[in-house]
Structure formats: structure tokens, C-alpha cells
Amino acid sequence: CDELTKITKKFDGNIVASIESRGFIFAGTIARDLGLPFVLARKPGKLPNETYKKSFDLEYGSTSIEIQKNTQIKPNDKIVIVDDLVATGGTAIACAELLSENFNVKNSNILILSIINLEDLGGRKLIQEKGFLIETLVDY
């Protein structure tokens, strides 16, 4: 997690978000180490309060993720979305769009930070085409 924390600090992120569920392991540590708020993006019905929802397609169907409306995100925040793996980029983009569309955060203020990127599946390119930033530790 040290390298992920360094990247978050270099980006000057002030909020750490994560996509259910393996990303929580890394994101929670980063948020704790840097003393930052931690925002959860979860499957529908898993969060206790009213949520914003974003549906998206996967290679094997469709699904959606939610973030609580009462999250204290402001338009000028710099948000780091932590996930374990980027494949096609669909889940990461859905989370980033959920934040940008509902909290008015600029795409350039959202960094998707992943442990692994599966290069042949094109997720990095699609994320960049949408105007979001991406950093990965390992590219396969």
C-alpha cells in the first residue's frame, strides 16, 4: 500500500473512494494513512442512506453501483478511486461518472488508481478518453 499512498499524495487527493469490494482493502489503508475521508461505491441496496446510482454494462451483463448522497464531496475535491483491477474500465468509469455527474467534480480531478491493469482489454485507453486520470502498479 505504500506505493498507492505515495501516488495519492502526489496527486494531492483529498478523498479516497473505492469500488466494492477488494478495493476496500487498499483504499481503507490509504485513507487511514493520509487521514482522508473514505467513500464507498457499492452494489445496490448495500448502503444505509439515500444514494445516487449508475448503471453500466459488463462483458457478461449489466449492473449498477451506488454512492450515498450525504457524502461530503465538493466540486473542487480531488478524488482517488482505488480498485484492485482494471479490465475493460467499465466499473471504474461508472464510479468516476457517478462522482462527476452527481457531485460536479471535474473529470481531471478524478484519479483511478489500480493495482493491476489488463492492457489488452483496453480499460486504460477508455478511461483516458473519458477525461479521467489513471495510474496502475502493474500492467499485464
Regions found by a protein language model. Give the residues of each.
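PRPP-associated nucleotide enzymes
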Residues: C1-V82, V86-Y140
